Amino acid sequence: MGPPVDPVPAGDSQPKSADVVIVGGGIIGVSTALFLAKRGVSVVLCEKGHIAGEQSSRNWGWCRRMGRDPRELPLIVEALKMWGDIEQLVGEDVGFRRTGILYLCQDESDVEHHSEWLKTAGDYALDTRMIEGRALADLMPGAQKNFRAALHTPSDGRAEPQKAAPAIARAARRAGAQILLRCAVRGIETEGGRVSGVVTENGLIRAGTVVVAGGAWSSRLCRDVGVRLPQLAVRSSVMRTAPVEGGPDGAAWTEGFAYRKRLDGGYTI
């Protein structure tokens, strides 16, 4: 779907114990490792393959507040502020750009639906607005279809999935986190009704706290400690293009179709 994932080399050896063990080397796992390590917490991250080997390198890379459930927005607003400082935080360019996102309206019912969200945007002083005509056409050069209007948030943006999680993992390692690759966690251990560690394919790591960030595999691990984690599997088709000159710089979505320009000049569709 996208360019190759930036490599994070192996090298750390498995310790006998840590304050926190994180299961999963996707963007949630590596971000947790980074901020714990920066606070001086002893943290070990266990990844069964390589960093960003699954969904964290295959997603759209959208960094957005637009269209979110109002209950998510306080957290998402803070998260986007952090994306704005990501290069300073991790010391690398992960492709974050505030290129804006469009929710395209094909008819009046779409306009009505998306206009409802403008009330939420106003509560958080977002720069979201409904655009149409020339304002919309200018954001979609070369478009062969005329859309009725679009919900637009210029300050939302995108990052490169193949770069972001690996860069954060490297920063976490520099901050003191131990990153174990090709080290699958087989189960979570408990003693006296409390988490006591994890069993990996290389043995036991004792820890009083375990963060399960295993993506599609999280529910399987959570069952070990009696936690039911509902998950929904969704299958979709995505393609990428070679670099294209011109074309829209931002990202857009409508029913059945979406696109995002990548840092290499191509599009994920």
Task: Identify what each model region corresponds to.
Residues G24-G26, K48:
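Glycine-rich Rossmann-fold phosphate-binding loop(s) that bind the pyrophosphate
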Residues M1-V20, K38-R39:
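Extreme N-terminal leader/targeting segments of oxidoreductases
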Residues G61-L139, G256-I269:
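Dinucleotide-binding Rossmann-like beta1-alpha1 core, especially the glycine-rich loop
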Residues L151-T209:
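Helical element adjacent to the flavin cofactor pocket in flavoenzyme catalytic cores
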